[in-house]
Structure formats: structure tokens, C-alpha cells
């Protein structure tokens, strides 16, 4: 393992710390709820869902966090303004954790940024995400909100190389008038969480691991990804899924360790149902990484898995 020469920033999101040197803080884990075709969702447009089942899933993640010391966030996914409003209200009611607000629609994300500001929850909200498709109206909504934490996505549709992704953040890569980091500054984002973006395997998925190290070395911001999207989009693995679902789950969950070994600070691990597997696996990786840097003057946090589970 290694220690970055660049000073590493530690973001504080509603009391949850993320970032730092490898082995310093436990990995922040975020499971997704209300995702596409989630069986607990009864009406995705209206945001109707099985509240009892949803609370059990949130509790499952919190139990994993309490056991291992790995902090957690709830990754809220909504497709309409009505649905994401209901989802935010529910998560705020049953959990005190930070949460990500995510939608494929920029108008929904913009609405969510205004809504959490109106109800006093902006300090717990992480915007997902500032990316190359962000619109002027979305930038204005985010800038006018009280949100100060956001994922900044390094996806570059024209050039998925390491250079293309880094330039998207720094300069806009010739596709935007300014880099995404500059846009984040204009929006008042203090806690910048860099996501290299996960492309399919065979189309540069592994570049995200290299970019994690490169971005932390260059800027020092907390960096991580939804790395499970690589195996979940792997055609070969999907063909095995029906006859061997355990194999699929092992690869999906196991990808967590790859991001951690590449100095990742946070992981969007996918369906929140996987919390029971992800938290012990992430804790194992955190322990081994902490041991690997023990002679590099990196002191693990008091609630690091190495201090709770060893």
C-alpha cells in the first residue's frame, strides 16, 4: 500500500467523515433504495411503497454499520418530483444518516435540492451528481440551495480514457465551458466526492480504479464509485445469473474490495439488500489496508473495523 504526498481532505457530512489517507477512515458505504423495479415500490411515479419493508432495509444497513464501524448513507433513487419528495420524507423519518438524492432526470434532482433546503435537511443531503449533462437550470437550482455536498462524476461520453475523465473534471474536456470542479465551486459545494464513473467491463471499467488513485493524488478529494455497476453490466456474468445466482452475487458484492484496494473512500454498493454481505466484506478490506499502512504513520480512526473487530 502507499501514502499520498498530497494532503488528503476529509469531508464531514452531517457528522459522517469520509476521505483521508488509505487506512485512516473506514470506507463509507451507501446502499440504494427505491431503485428501478425494486420490489418494495408499489408506484414509482407517485412514490408509493411498502413502508415496513423499506424500514427493515434501512435498519439492515444501520445494523451493518453499527457492527463494523463503516459509516453509511442511504442512496435514494426517484424518477419523479412526487416520488423523490416522499422518499426523502421517509428516510429522514426513519434514519439520521446522510442520504444521496439521485434521479435520471435533472429536473427531479433540482427539485430535490430545493426541497431539502426548504425542510432543513440540506446538511444531510449529497447531490448525485454534478456531471457532463448538467443543465443551466439545474446548476442554478443547486447554487440557490443549501446543499454543500455532491458527487462529481468523471464520465466523459466522448473520451472514456483516464485523460478524458480527468479533463472533464478540470477543464470540461472541450465539451463544457468549464470543468465540473469549477461548476461545483459555483454551486457552493464544499464536500466534493469524486466518482471516476464506472463503464462496462471491456469498455474501460478498470480505468475507474486507476483514476481513483490519480484523482486523490492530484486533488486530495474523497474518491469512490458505484463499482458494482461493472460486474452487473457484464454480459457473461448476466448469462450465468439464472443458473447460478450465487456466482452473480459474489462478483457483484466482491467488487467492493477492488475499489477499496485502489484507495477508494466511499462505495455506492447497489441494492440495499446486500448490506448484510457488503459491510463485513468492506470491514475485512479496511482492516487489511490499515495493517498494510501501519508503518506509514497513518493512525486508524477509533471506530475503524480494525479497532472493533480484531
Swiss-Prot record:
Listed EC numbers: 2.1.1.-
InterPro entries: Dihydropteroate_synth-like_sf (IPR011005), MeTrfase_MtrH/MtxH (IPR023467), MtrH (IPR028342)
Lineage: Archaea, Methanobacteriati, Methanobacteriota, Stenosarchaea group, Methanomicrobia
Family: Belongs to the MtrH family.
Coiled coil regions in record: none
Listed GO MF terms: methyltransferase activity
Name under which the protein is recorded: Putative methyltransferase mtx subunit H
Family matches, as Pfam families: MtrH
Encoding gene per record: mtxH
Assembly information from the UniProt record: May be part of a complex composed of 3 subunits; MtxA, MtxH and MtxX.
Keyword Methyltransferase attributed: yes
GO BP: methylation; one-carbon metabolic process
Keyword annotations: Methyltransferase, Transferase
Organism: Methanosarcina acetivorans (strain ATCC 35395 / DSM 2834 / JCM 12185 / C2A)
Amino acid at each position: 500500500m502507499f501514502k499520498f504526498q498530497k494532503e488528503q481532505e476529509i469531508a464531514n457530512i452531517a457528522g459522517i467523515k469520509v476521505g483521508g489517507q488509505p487506512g485512516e477512515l473506514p470506507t463509507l458505504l451507501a446502499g440504494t433504495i427505491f431503485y428501478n423495479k425494486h420490489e418494495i415500490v408499489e408506484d414509482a411515479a407517485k412514490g408509493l411503497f411498502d413502508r415496513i419493508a423499506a424500514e427493515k432495509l434501512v435498519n439492515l444497513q444501520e445494523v451493518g454499520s453499527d457492527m463494523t464501524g463503516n459509516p453509511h448513507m442511504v442512496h435514494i433513487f426517484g424518477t419523479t418530483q412526487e416520488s423523490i419528495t416522499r422518499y426523502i420524507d421517509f428516510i429522514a423519518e426513519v434514519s439520521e444518516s446522510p442520504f444521496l438524492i439521485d434521479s435520471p432526470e435533472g429536473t427531479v434532482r433540482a427539485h430535490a435540492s430545493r426541497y431539502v433546503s426548504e425542510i432543513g435537511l440540506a446538511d444531510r443531503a449529497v447531490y448525485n451528481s454534478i456531471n457532463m449533462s448538467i443543465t443551466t437550470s439545474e446548476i442554478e437550482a443547486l447554487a440557490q440551495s443549501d446543499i454543500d455536498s455532491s458527487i462529481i462524476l468523471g464520465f466523459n461520453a466522448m473520451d472514456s480514457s483516464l485523460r478524458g475523465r480527468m479533463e472533464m473534471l478540470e477543464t470540461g474536456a472541450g465539451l463544457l465551458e468549464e470543468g465540473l470542479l469549477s461548476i461545483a465551486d459555483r454551486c457552493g459545494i464544499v464536500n466534493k466526492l469524486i466518482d471516476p464513473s464506472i463503464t462496462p467491463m471491456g469498455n474501460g471499467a478498470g480505468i475507474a480504479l486507476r483514476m481513483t488513485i490519480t484523482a486523490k493524488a492530484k486533488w486530495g478529494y474523497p474518491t469512490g464509485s458505484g463499482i458494482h455497476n461493472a460486474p452487473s453490466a457484464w454480459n457473461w456474468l448476466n448469462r450465468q445469473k439464472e443458473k447460478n445466482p450465487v456466482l452473480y452475487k459474489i462478483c457483484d458484492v466482491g467488487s467492493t474490495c477492488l475499489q477499496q484496494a485502489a484507495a477508494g473512500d466511499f462505495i455506492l454498493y447497489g441494492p440495499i439488500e446486500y448490506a448484510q454481505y457488503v459491510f463485513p466484506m468492506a470491514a475485512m478490506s479496511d482492516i487489511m489496508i490499515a495493517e498494510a499502512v501501519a508503518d506509514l504513520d497513518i493512525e486508524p480512526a477509533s471506530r475503524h473495523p480494525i479497532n472493533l473487530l480484531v
